[in-house]
């Protein structure tokens, strides 16, 4: 069994902001000022979910309600479901307009547009229980960095010309004709986790060394801060290791590794672990998953920076 230090530290990179959109909408992201210098967009996920459309031939309207029928495509199978809404428009003279491929629709009356929506975001605006919306969940295909620290503020706009994103996005569309391909832009914030072992009998030398080390590591993590680019690097690597996306190659089997200079500060500080945490059910109203990770509203995983033979996990019960 590996050793444990009297005081152990871990860095938890917690999902702070996430925006989902399609590639053609990247040009509009900066208009919303959703990402800023305090919560910049450094990482992006390329994801897929079933293709969602509306059946314009099954639209119904009465004084009491409007009925819309949506279609979920799963490979070569098509499932329909109906949603009814109270008619608050004080008229039955409402038309549904949707051109092929029926992923966008309008509700109009006398030339006035009442609703103008893309099907997927429209359905995503409803509580999950209301529409049984597991078809809105996102399968992670690729994870990458938007840009380095210097380009953080303009990253969403500059992603329009990001060659790696464009190439993988296009390949995903070709390989998944029954699916919609979505981008999830993400910002992560650091949470420092500290554990002090009051049960293990340490030697005086170990305790003295810990008294010297503890404030240095604490100050570095909480005040001076780890290099921002290194945080982006190990967050990306940890997410790739966790989700094992189809289109990622590096980090799948090689994280963590002390030979990687791109996050060497973690080893210099001799911290115990790095963690990733994503709570997407409330933020974007869907779950994330991959071939190796099941659907869940919340994902958290820790990665020990050393083998268990060298170092005991701070998350194990003492």
Regions found by a protein language model. Give the residues of each.
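Boundary/linker segments flanking structured domains
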Residues: 1-318
